[in-house]
Regions:
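Sigma70-family region 2
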Residues: 6, 22-40
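C-terminal edge and immediately downstream basic/flexible tail or linker adjoining helix-turn-helix-like DNA-binding
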Residues: 66-67, 124-127, 141-161
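A short pre-motif secondary-structure segment
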Residues: 108-112
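Structural recognition of an alpha-helix C-terminal capping motif at a helix-to-coil junction
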Residues: 16-23, 41-53
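Internal acidic/polar
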Residues: 64-91
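Short, charged helix-capping/linker segments at alpha-helix termini
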Residues: 1-20, 153-154, 161
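Arg/Lys-rich amphipathic alpha helix in sigma70-family domain 2
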Residues: 27, 31-33, 48-69, 139
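Short, small-hydrophobic-rich alpha-helical interface motif
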Residues: 4, 14-25, 122, 133, ...
Length: 161
């Protein structure tokens, strides 16, 4: 379910992605062929791949509702001081922060950082330009930094009081 949460707008969308993914898995289970000696890891990878591509399909289906304009912006890596509070944040909080991003930003961020897709692969899968992928990733990182900064300020206020 965590994969679905990363790509969904809300819990209902995550459940829809999960259900669609399991339908695909049940329909295609006969095609599964273990790629490695360790069948469990191979099967988990196969399931994960189906869920990710189901989430991409969900994004494409709803793309017209949340397209972001194309901009060619260079992607910059966040500096250490910009993400310094990350170690104070739980996994569930990170997922909630990611869910607060727009669908376009959230999808590109998840595909790039979590799934390891290249910008070229993201552009091909989502039907956007490489520049848009880079721009959306940069904007997603910037928004997450703001969210994290605000969260840290709230935590500091609570600790003082």
């Amino acid at each position: 379910m965590a994969i679905c949460d990363c790509y969904a707008n809300n819990e209902d969308d995550a459940i829809e992605i999960l259900n669609d993914g399991f339908l695909k898995i049940f329909k295609e289970i006969h095609r599964y062929k273990p790629a490695y000696a360790n069948e469990i890891n191979s099967f988990k990878g196969w399931l994960r791949k189906i869920m990710v591509y189901t989430a991409i399909d969900h994004f494409r289906k709803n793309k017209k509702h949340h397209l972001v304009g194309e901009l060619d912006v260079a992607v910059t890596q966040p500096s250490a001081h910009e993400i310094s509070g990350l170690d104070k944040v739980s996994y569930d909080e990170i997922i909630r922060f990611i869910q607060r991003l727009s669908p376009a930003y959230r999808t590109v961020l998840s595909l790039f950082i979590i799934e390891g897709f290249s910008h070229e692969e993201i552009a091909e899968q989502l039907g956007i330009s490489v520049g848009t992928s880079k721009s959306n990733l940069a904007k997603a990182r910037k928004q997450l930094q703001k969210i994290l900064h605000n969260q840290n300020q709230i935590s500091e206020i609570k600790n003082v009081g």
